[in-house]
Amino acid sequence: MFFSCVKHEMPNQFITVLGNVQDAGYPHIGCKKNCCNKNFNSSAVNFVTSLGVTDLVDNKSFLFEATPDISKQLKFLNNNYSSSTIVDGVFITHAHIGHYTGLMYFGREALGAHKVPVYVMPRMKQFLESNSPWNQLIDLDNVQLREIFKNKKITISKNLIIVPFTVPHRDEFSETVGYKIIGPNKSALFIPDINKWSLWDKDIVAEVKDVDYAFLDATFFKDGEVNRPMDEIPHPFIVETINLFKNESIQVKNKIHFIHFNHTNISLQYKNPVIDSIRKLGYNFARFGDQLSL
């Protein structure tokens, strides 16, 4: 599933994990607890959740989410290929801070980009067009919004197709979408945010079985993890997802890559006996730099 970064072994199309943390980042602002102290000086890289998709044949790369860490994420992504453009497109899931605010770095105060394609659903498009400073990016041609629609295929290269789909989430400013990323040989789901699997009009087990990789919302490990009513910030707990897949084969479980970890989530600990036991069941935990062939 994973492959070496030695150049001659690299496939032509692949996904790169560019971040695995919830919107607020790691360490979390204002957190003085052990969760944000004991691992802070480790060698682990924990950027806000994002994926890169690269096609070496067409010499193109795409970003999924424009996070506050976008500058460092694009620097890492661009190490894999050479192109005259910094990125060939950005796909946004929704209007929460960790998923779109990195667009600001395409503006005149930073890159001063020219017409970077930004793929957005209708409500997200309207949100960006109607609010400053985002509409300045459009007015100055720093970005070019490309409207996409539920379940409609988008061909981004000769070998790659993207399919957006909606998921239930706190849609204060925009709809929330996930993406299916389809390569010539393998495919992946990317669902960094959803309220609960039971609220979706699709069966998550069936959807995972239909792909090779599934990057799934794992914001919290279990109930009671934070000192606030967790129904205010609904997400499927990792323990809930594991329970849903408990009767599935290790091959199915191995498709799952948990992602989008809150700072309190023990999944951020690289050495933890509980996490190790879950890995032994077949599950994966997304780590910066992971690469998976398409």
Residue positions per predicted region:
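A short helix-to-beta-strand connector/capping loop
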Residues: 11, 114, 138-144, 157-160, ...
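Bacterial N-terminal signal peptides
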Residues: 1-2
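Active-site metal-binding motif and surrounding structural segment of the metallo-beta-lactamase
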Residues: 54, 59-119, 212
